A protein has these predicted regions:
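Thiol-based oxidoreductase modules, predominantly thioredoxin-like and allied folds used
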Residues: 50-66, 75
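Eukaryotic intrinsically disordered and solvent-exposed regulatory patches
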Residues: 10-12
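A short, glycine- and basic residue-enriched loop/turn
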Residues: 74-77, 90
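Local sequence-structure signature of Cys/Sec-based thiol-disulfide redox active-site neighborhoods
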Residues: 15-52
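Non-catalytic, surface beta->alpha helical segment in thiol-disulfide oxidoreductase systems
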Residues: 82-112
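Acidic beta-strand-to-loop metal/phosphate-binding motif
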Residues: 26, 79-83
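Short, Lys/Arg-enriched N-terminal segments with co-localized hydrophobic residues
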Residues: 1-6
Length: 114
């Protein structure tokens, strides 16, 4: 019973993170020190968009690392979420960055505050 409860608490935490951060990256490590090549490439693509983004280091949050793939229906990390929607992982993000779609998406999600 206890384990099931903690599982639903983790799912609630994931939902809250996704809902409260317009642009959110679940990654291994942090943007300054990514702990895998896929996370590093995704961070680079996001940084090139020139907007701030939130991140969750799944290596320091093993319970999120365990639950998020099932919640997202996406098995791998990193995962980029924009406005509550899963955009995808490294391959998708890199491709979107190359064709300009990523910047368009991020700019639309985070309009300049001036």
């Amino acid at each position: 019973v206890n384990e099931r409860n903690s599982m639903s608490e983790v799912v609630a935490q994931i939902k809250e993170q996704i809902e409260s951060n317009t642009v959110l990256l679940y990654m291994k490590g942090n943007p300054n020190q990514p702990q895998c090549g896929f996370s590093a490439r995704t961070v680079t693509a996001l940084m090139e968009c020139g907007k701030r983004f939130a991140y969750v280091d799944i290596l320091t949050n093993p319970e999120i690392r365990a639950q998020l793939p099932a919640y997202a229906n996406w098995p791998t990390f990193p995962q980029l979420w924009v406005k509550g929607e899963l955009v995808g992982g490294c391959d998708i993000i890199t491709e979107m960055a190359e064709n300009g779609e990523l910047k368009t998406l991020i700019d639309a999600a985070l309009p300049d505050e001036d």
